[in-house]
């Protein structure tokens, strides 16, 4: 009888908890932008899986708790926030987990315009902020870490052009050039205010501050920073140093990277021949100089051989890509002495009937994967690659000519998953709930 009373008491307690959750954390409906339905808001940090921070030791990443090496197989889905669909974001993160992927790079910004996160300088949409909360919360539930980018060089979703427009509207004296983003005090203050709002945000689901959230792998200062005028290069370099130091002043838990494409500047003249063309040296980007900044923890590189070399044969693109990757691996290991991530690796999906895009993409991806795996075996600087970009059904409006629904491309799906397997077998790190099903 006493055992039955205890059982009834336990059942009553569980029922009470259920009523409290349904009362205080009701289903919240999708904010629009791509379907999705609703989701239940459960701010219970003790339900989150334990996850250590990612850290850096010399030229490679480590588990901050154990010191074990971390090598990344990841992907880009920039649209997780702008889609404003928790259901689609959750599905993408689940699919990433099924492939053994460990890091997703996505945008943590949406500046101005309809449905923006930052409506105007320092003014935010709480509803959109809660979408970002959910993305981070759901990433941790799936043992995925996020690289969160803080602003765009491009005009997409606002970018630095929106900051310039805001400053001009406020009466700031400046030219129309978006290069003002890197040097004008008003714009730099806007950016710092935004960074502070993001880093000090307390997640409405987990109640964990972003700066204390281990599911965040790193902060990226800008997506593909470039200048209009080559004379603005020193301003970009100073901006990187200032903003990296500012991020670190607010958050010592997380890694910081610039977000560069990896183009070489005039600092080391013999490297200019590694660029895809003379045009690349005129964009102010200088891979070595930008990445050498004290508070930058790792270098970033992009790889788009098809769009960078549109007239080249596949054989020429393969040869170029191999040299591009090798050069950045060697410079990161020997000069920078920092890890390097190939944070975007993409190949155009041609629509013509004679195109062999999937096969060509797999060839390009395999080159990068093999070089990363070889680096991982040697505990060297090549620390991972992230395909651009993965989608799920219902996100076509956020796609581009590089987008892939992986399960619709069996060869690509297998290639991505096999890379996850290879890296897991080396050091056994990553999602403890994911086991490779591909025989060695």
Swiss-Prot record:
Annotated catalytic residues: 224, 344
InterPro entries registered for this protein in UniProt: Glyco_hydro_5, Glycoside_hydrolase_SF, MAN-like
Signal sequence range: 1-22
Known tissue expression: Expressed in stems and leaves, and at lower levels in roots and seeds.
Pfam families given in the database record: Cellulase
EC numbers on record: 3.2.1.78
Keywords: Glycoprotein, Glycosidase, Hydrolase, Secreted, Signal
Source domain of life: Eukaryota
GO biological process: one example: polysaccharide catabolic process
Positions annotated to bind substrate: 107, 223, 304, 388
GO CC terms: extracellular region
Reaction catalysed by this enzyme: Random hydrolysis of (1->4)-beta-D-mannosidic linkages in mannans, galactomannans and glucomannans
Glycosylated residues in this chain: 173, 176, 230, 330, 356, 401, 418
GO molecular function: mannan endo-1,4-beta-mannosidase activity
Protein's cellular compartments: Secreted
Record-stated family: Belongs to the glycosyl hydrolase 5 (cellulase A) family.
Protein name: Mannan endo-1,4-beta-mannosidase 6
Originating species: Oryza sativa subsp. japonica
UniProt gene name: MAN6
